[in-house]
């Protein structure tokens, strides 16, 4: 069976994924699938850096605003709904372009491992999500408990080994139906960090404080409230810290998150990054996409 061609734009927060995704969608007759765990939530627009209405008018976006704020969203939900979106886009004769920085979601969509049956697949992904939330120390402690020997530097192999130990022969390795062109965006670290700091300031100017206060007042304990951009402001609302300290914490957490994203994509998905500071970087990417789409 011929594989479905997908384009995936990945990289750290604030690097310019949204803008590139829209440009590629306009150039190659594509539609965008958001690969972000927070952008699924309605009414949370500023803190999630959701594509603006003007940007969404330039290219159709899937998996944005598909959950109420008080609903949970899992990697299983994403994979299931992303597959539907891919089929919908393909049926229109268009190119699916996945844009996002939630690495576990993208990896789970692209790879071929699965358990038989829909309920079992949900079980696998829930277990994987639980393992991913563990620290390195806790993860390798689980390996030790089960007498599994894995190099401590390799989280991916560790998680796969634990999945195999839990599910055994029920864990099947089928070929992925997707042929994916991974486009990784990166920038000089200090330039990226400066951009993150400026973006947080712009978010505050655009009403992030009010958006976070609404979430704090109405849904302080839901999954969505745990996201970066909201949880840092909650201590300010409860009068534990001044606003300046909360904003500084938000900037710091976002920078750390960007670093973790880069590490994930490098180590877990073998992404080769293109520096957005390079001259004509978008033209280079467009040539890669054109060659990919024209190949058999």
From Swiss-Prot:
The record marks 102, 128 as: Interaction with substrate tRNA. SUPFAM superfamilies: P-loop containing nucleoside triphosphate hydrolases (SSF52540). The keyword Acyltransferase does not apply. The keyword Transport does not apply. Substrate binds at residues 13-18. It catalyses: adenosine(37) in tRNA + dimethylallyl diphosphate = N(6)-dimethylallyladenosine(37) in tRNA + diphosphate. It holds the Pfam family IPPT. Keywords: ATP-binding, Magnesium, Nucleotide-binding, Transferase, tRNA processing. One of its GO terms (biological process) is tRNA modification. ATP binds at residues 11-18. Coiled coil: none annotated. Residues 36-39 are annotated as: Interaction with substrate tRNA. Its EC number is 2.5.1.75. Its cofactor is Mg(2+). GO terms for molecular function: ATP binding; tRNA dimethylallyltransferase activity. InterPro entries: Dimethylallyltransferase (IPR039657), IPT (IPR018022), P-loop_NTPase (IPR027417). Catalyzes the transfer of a dimethylallyl group onto the adenine at position 37 in tRNAs that read codons beginning with uridine, leading to the formation of N6-(dimethylallyl)adenosine (i(6)A). Monomer. Belongs to the IPP transferase family. This is tRNA dimethylallyltransferase. The lineage of its organism: Bacteria, Bacillati, Bacillota, Bacilli, Lactobacillales.
